[in-house]
Amino acid sequence: MSNNVVITGANRGIGLAMCMHFKAQGDKVFALCRNSSTDLEELNVNVIEGIDVASDIGVDNMVAALSNVDIDVLVCNAGILRDESLSQLNLDTIREQFEINALAPLRVVATLQANLNEGAKVALITSRMGSISDNTSGGRYGYRMSKAALNAAAMSLSHDLASKKIAVGIYHPGYVQTEMVNYGGDISASDSAKKLVGLINQLTQDQSGVFKHSNGSVLPW
């Protein structure tokens, strides 16, 4: 059975690769992004440009484009990484990461909740860097704090959407070879996306609100 799958941040990296894997299994993919890419256009999915999930106009564009779409799977993947240290704090980049990594996914889910079918799935692409107990190296203040906030929002969503039997998956993709980390990761975007799509396929109500690595292991908060 084909699902309607909506993915944010879909023009490159993990988002692009997830579009590819969902399409390969027969799903109808709606790829949301600010600007498309050649690689995304070649996938022959439904590309919706002009979607900046951190802006009012971008969210309005999203609502208009998806007004008649019943969503089975919603993947909030858009995110950014900036670098701050204790000696070089930049409150502007910390705020920017909160807007895009934490507030925007929550806003996307809240705005599209009327489009979500009963029994739908919401996947939030987070990071183990948002784990408090797993933080053994410090630094990366904005990224760590914003992903911890996303994890907290995801847990609340898992409770608030339960009445519609909507399951919420909270996923760390791994250290992925993407532009965000200058391609210095240890797993390709395609391999990570394949694992994530597999986890989303298997997501059930009893696993809602569980923080998982793309390899399937449960991560600590």
Regions of interest found by a model, annotated:
Residues L43-I57:
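Rossmann-fold cofactor-recognition segment
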Residues S85-I94, K121-A162:
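Catalytic loop of short-chain dehydrogenase/reductase
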Residues I170-Y171, T178, N182-W221:
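C-terminal helical subdomain
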Residues N11-M20:
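N-terminal Rossmann NAD(P)H-binding glycine-rich loop of SDR-like oxidoreductase domains
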Residues N77-E84:
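Conserved NAD(P)H cofactor-binding loop of Rossmann-fold oxidoreductase domains
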Residues Q25-L40:
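Conserved glycine-rich Rossmann-like NAD(P)H-binding loop of the short-chain dehydrogenase/reductase
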Residues I7-T8, C76-N77, K121-S127, A167-H172:
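Structural signature of the Rossmann-like NAD(P)-dependent dehydrogenase/reductase core
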